[in-house]
Amino acid sequence: MKKTLMAVGLAAVMSIPFAANAADYVIDTKGAHASINFKVNHLGYSYIKGRFNKFDGEFSYDPANIAASSVVVNVDTRSLDSNHAERDKHIRSADFIDASKYSTATFKSTEVVDKGNGQLEVKGDLTLHGQTKPIVINAEFIGAGQDPWGGQRSGFAGTTRLELKDFGIQVMGASSYVDMELHVEGVQK
């Protein structure tokens, strides 16, 4: 009887770290602790940088089982901001991303691969400009822990390159692709 109780107790204690590791997070856009940034070649002479000001999403992260992790992000394409109102109006127009017709871009992961040393490969489907294509985000786990307000946070950074023609977006000059830089901090639900 004593051995049985010890075995049950040991099993319960050993399961605690695994249960505590799996967590669901809301991306902290309200606290401005997340950003979706872009960089695009401008006529072969320089780069234009910008961001999307409105987006939301969630992710699930389990450091003990990276493959069980997932992410979903929704981006309001009308919130594109390159710090130049006339250019933003043109990029949002039907000439390019047609934000009035395709006001939301969505990324849903299909697989998260642990590459070791905090490096991750996040594979998923991006719906942009009415077309859904598979993409890969090269990501890095930045850190996790308790914030000053008693909540739990987890943070990541990632990059990917999008070929505009893959999403039916007009290519102009040297701007055949856009580089994306992502910074995500989540607050545990």
Swiss-Prot record:
InterPro entries (UniProt xref): Lipid/polyisoprenoid-bd_YceI, TTHA0802/YceI-like_sf, UPF0312/YceI
Xref: Gene3D superfamilies: Lipid/polyisoprenoid-binding, YceI-like
One GO CC term, this protein: extracellular space
Record bears the keyword Signal: yes
Primary localisation category: periplasm
Signal peptide: 1-22
Localization (cell): Periplasm
Keywords: Periplasm, Signal
Keyword Lyase found: no
Matching Pfam families: YceI
PANTHER family from the UniProt entry: PROTEIN YCEI
Family: Belongs to the UPF0312 family. Type 1 subfamily.
Name of the protein: UPF0312 protein VC_A0539
Organism: Vibrio cholerae serotype O1 (strain ATCC 39315 / El Tor Inaba N16961)
